[in-house]
Amino acid sequence: MTSHGRKVVRVVARVKPSTDLASTKSISVQKPMGDDSETVTISFGAQFAGSKDSYRLDYCYEENETTGSILTKEIKPLISTVFEGKDANVIAHGARNSGKTHLIQGNERELGLAVLTMSEMLSMAEERGDAIFVSVYEVSQETVYDLLDQEKRVVSVLEGAQGKIQLKGLSQVPVKSLSEFQNLYFGFKKSQKLTSDLPTRSHKGVMIHVTTGNANSGSLGRMNFLDMAGYEDSRKQNSALGPLEIARVNKSIYALQNVMYALNANESHVPYRESKLTRMLKDCLKGSNITLLITCLPREFSQDSFYMLNLASRICLGGNRAITNPTKKKINGLDRSVSLSSAAQRRQTPLTMSAASRKQTVLRGNVTERKTKINTATSAIKARKLFGEANDSVKCKNSSKKVEGKAKMVLKKGISTSKVVLSVQASSPKEEICSSITVTDFQSSLVEEEYSLAFSSSTVAMEPGYSNGASLSSEAIYTTDKETPRKQEEMFAGATHCDDAFVDKAQIVERDENNSVIEEDLTLVIDEGENLDKENNSLLANETASPPLSMRLQELSNNLKSICKFSNQLSVPEKHQTPLTILQAEEASEHSDITAEAAVSIELRTPEKTMPSNIGCSPWKTYSAHSSKLKNSAVGEYLKFINTAGKEDLKKLKGIGDKRAAYIVELREESPFKTLDDLQSIGLSAKQVNGLLKKEIGEIF
């Protein structure tokens, strides 16, 4: 098998010989190098809708080539591997009436592949002094029957501790001559015709065991011949079988196709458990064992045959992909880490002007009120530390998405707003971030994306100026609407984390490694409606005699520390759950000079519904609610333990042995267990999973 020894599954086609020479041939086979071609191309007439131009397989035996040529080129190399201790498989599949049974079994006049192979194996066993035993089985409706037993007993497919498949109840009959094998093989066919009352379709197989002497000695290898049931479209109305039985047969065919593709593509997971047939042949298919998949095609092409040829070509292409990338399975984890690191680098890359402009949000509409603009020169908001290293703005993006939801909710509730335009520009010449956010009236049409804010009525404009990138000056300009009286405004200097809260006015100055000064100004207005003249006079007086810059920076730092430490969680009454709420802050720490009346914060976030202790004023409802919360907590801790514990710790759980623990460790590397239903992938049913969890929780009490 030098030409195709690297492939686990070799996919070939066989065109069924036709006795009617006058019938037209619809299949065309292209062999670039004749009989020595490593791949061939099969095409057919254009009368089949939805078909591709051609299909590529490893080889195709045309109708003028005999069964002996298949034996010489394909089967004999497999026989030598069986006597070397490996398993080999010959599987014939295709549509109905495509010649599968005749190819494998043959008849008394024209021998099939199974009989011809047995003749070769008997002669080799006689030379080597080995013994041969035969098992004949049938798989019908996900049940395995022993055809050499007179009562056709059911064969149990069991899996041992080491993962080895055991076929309990499958008899092995010694065979010393070809006539004995023919009597066994064709004898069960005659008895089957007598006992079958209703038309049934099943998969039939012959398993030839090679042992060193007798059945009790060590087994060398096995040769399997499998005659698959014919594929048939379940939508056909003229079928003698019911649609349920056709669906079951097709399901087992699909399961075998998936296993063949996974083996040929060298995938890490092979779905042996999808059907009883693939689970039964697991030991014969896995590892370095070789499989010959023969796709039988009739001379007169049908839609069912076209579909089976399409599946066979898919399996063949999977083998070519595995040969092209032989180390894919080994470096899968490395590829995953490289992709994660590259994704992290993309997240840490600062936004450029073009990238930020794509994030702009514009809410267009007809505005009837006076338009007011807020121009704020700032950089991207930094996270957590006031004088720390510059961090990326990924966290701010999540907060902005939350703000967008709140703003849209406010607009839907009919809150009249002025048009607000927020322009953000970076202070450093190397960074230019410009995003505009526009909010219109409730009557305007809402259109697009992210960072949209909704503020009520009047606004405040901050215009900071810079001197040599190190000095800071700010001037507050207060504007009011003509229709309303002058409104009171409270200033509160501070800064917040982008995921925690928004403060009325926050000015944060940071020096990065390039000695660039970044100022963050976040302005928001709280309307009170009284004592405006006195407050404005006092504010102007404070501005004329402002303290030194260092003292102001120290005060801002202390304010930020106190806010981050003592900020309260948002609590909203059930009758008035709005996204905009004003919280009176608790008294700050001893480092803060701001009173509780001035510490007013507005937090834009969805209110969390807390679970009251008197749900519906019913003790039973209260108990049920707390029980549900306790159950969810227990399930979460159990899944967390499954995803993080080592193999030895997993074995301490009830019902988890060495094999299941190893399987859990293997599966969670690909994808962690998120729900209890995911534990069914290790071979547990939903009832068994619930039983394991009950045992673990029951030991607490």
Curated annotation (Swiss-Prot):
InterPro entries: Kinesin-like_fam, Kinesin_motor_dom, Kinesin_motor_dom_sf, P-loop_NTPase, RuvA_2-like. Coiled coil: none annotated. The gene is KIN10C. Residues 8-318 form the Kinesin motor domain. Pfam families: HHH_3 (PF12836), Kinesin (PF00225). Belongs to the TRAFAC class myosin-kinesin ATPase superfamily. Kinesin family. KIN-10 subfamily. SUPFAM superfamilies: P-loop containing nucleoside triphosphate hydrolases, RuvA domain 2-like. GO terms for biological process: microtubule-based movement. The keyword Ion transport does not apply. ATP binds at G94, A95, R96, N97, S98, G99, K100, T101. This is Kinesin-like protein KIN-10C. Keywords: ATP-binding, Microtubule, Motor protein, Nucleotide-binding. It comes from the Eukaryota. Gene3D superfamilies: AF1531-like domain (1.10.150.280), Kinesin motor domain (3.40.850.10). GO terms for cellular component: microtubule. GO terms for molecular function: ATP binding; microtubule binding; microtubule motor activity.
